[in-house]
Amino acid sequence: MATKKHGEACHSEQSEETWFAVRQSHIHAHASQIKSKDRVSQRGEVFTAEREVNAMLDLVANECLRPDSRFLEPACGDGNFLAAILRRKLSELRRKYKKSPRDYEKLSIVAIGSLYGVDIMNDNVEECRKRLFNIWNEEYTAHCKADSFDETREAAQFIISRNIINGNALTLMCVDAEGNDTTAPIVFSEWTLIGSTQMQRSDYTMADLLLHNDTSKKDGMGNLFALTEEQKEEGGIFLRRYITHYKRVQDYEGHRDEL
């Protein structure tokens, strides 16, 4: 995780559509936690050490085991938090579906679809995407063996490309190669398993999700995707929806610059 000078850890109420925002307090920057002094001074970029990552995730350990518990990292860096969460989710799936490669495959796609990240640095975004896919693919190949398919790998890569975004979490806009805001809003895709094999993708701008999200609770907990269908559509925040086999989500590109 790349962090600014301050932050806080918080999580949403436990439900089937839980959304987590994971942040951290400022920590002393060891050499392994920074890429360069310039990036620290210009962007406040400091990566979270593994010990701190695991200590924070242990506070919500049960949610880290559910494939559909959603986590958002608004300054994800190269993915320290998201990678650790994914490992926990996949480890639990492997334990529960030791003898069922098909169920493991399907739910591992749900797990990868539950992780969201934003970072202003393009190289961090690329590294985070690659890191998450490599973790997922290593576990998928090891567990499913001959029952693993390139089609499913393509689906996982596509979902990761939609969920890990090169953007500015403060302005809620995508950014260019220099980290400057573009005219394209950050868009998140909600991935929902329907029945045994169908997956529904619903796209919303991050700005509208935050605007309509209930953050009035004293504990600061909220759920970005907790709105009813009527609220989403009446509020004008729903952008598009696709339903297809979970292995074929990549058939619907839905480029952000077309919004």
Regions found by a protein language model. Name each.
Residues 2-6, 13, 19-26, 30-259:
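SAM-dependent methyltransferase catalytic region
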